[in-house]
């Protein structure tokens, strides 16, 4: 079965390349485009209307609109301006007056993964405890 299909495929390729045109072998019923397809000129026109083309043109930098912050800028006593709702550090600040936690100085007390990153503390053997 596979050899028969391969011979048919070989025959089709030979006829298509050396014989009659493909339109006579497998006629196309509707050669016109059925949907909205754009040719090369329409693609170029659409690209020229886009924002990237305007950025690449010389002298167009002043014409494009600047992105503004949703928050109005507030002037600090130092003279610098920054919006009042600007994102700050994502670190959670420690509450005032709290005592800092002393971390383990002995690095052998931690488990290490294959990338050299610390991922947990080693469990002390129960026999060593009691």
Curated annotation (Swiss-Prot):
The modification Phosphotyrosine is found at residue 110. The modification Tyrosine amide is found at residue 119. InterPro entries: Metastasis-suppressor_KiSS-1. It holds the Pfam family Kisspeptin. One of its GO terms (biological process) is positive regulation of cytosolic calcium ion concentration. Residues 1-19 form the signal peptide. GO terms for molecular function: G protein-coupled receptor binding; kisspeptin receptor binding. Keywords: Amidation, Cleavage on pair of basic residues, Disulfide bond, Phosphoprotein, Secreted, Signal. It is found in: Secreted. Highest levels in the cecum and colon. Moderate levels present in the liver, spleen, kidney, ovary, uterus and small intestine. Low levels in the stomach, pancreas and placenta. Expressed only moderately in the placenta. Persistent expression is detected in hypothalamus throughout postnatal development, with maximum expression levels at puberty in both male and female. Hypothalamic expression is sensitive to neonatal imprinting by estrogen. Expression is higher in the hypothalamus than in the brainstem and spinal cord. Residues 110-119 are annotated as: Essential for receptor binding and receptor activation. One of its GO terms (cellular component) is neuronal cell body. Disulfide bonds join 71-85. Metastasis suppressor protein. May regulate events downstream of cell-matrix adhesion, perhaps involving cytoskeletal reorganization. Generates a C-terminally amidated peptide, metastin which functions as the endogenous ligand of the G-protein coupled receptor GPR54. The receptor is also essential for normal gonadotropin-released hormone physiology and for puberty. The hypothalamic KiSS1/GPR54 system is a pivotal factor in central regulation of the gonadotropic axis at puberty and in adulthood. Belongs to the KISS1 family. This is Metastasis-suppressor KiSS-1. It comes from Rattus norvegicus. The gene is Kiss1.
């Amino acid at each position: 079965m596979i050899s028969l299909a391969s011979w048919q495929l070989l025959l089709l390729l030979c006829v298509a390349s050396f014989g009659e045109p493909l339109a006579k072998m497998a006629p196309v019923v509707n050669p016109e485009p059925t949907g909205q397809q754009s040719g090369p000129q329409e693609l170029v026109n659409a690209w020229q209307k886009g924002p990237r083309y305007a950025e690449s043109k010389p002298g167009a930098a002043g014409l494009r609109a600047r992105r503004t912050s949703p928050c109005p800028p507030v002037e600090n006593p130092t003279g610098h301006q920054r919006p009042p709702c600007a994102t700050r550090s994502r670190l959670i600040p420690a509450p005032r007056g709290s005592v800092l936690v002393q971390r383990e100085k002995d690095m052998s007390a931690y488990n290490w993964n294959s990338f050299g990153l610390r991922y947990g503390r080693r469990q002390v053997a129960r026999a060593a405890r009691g």
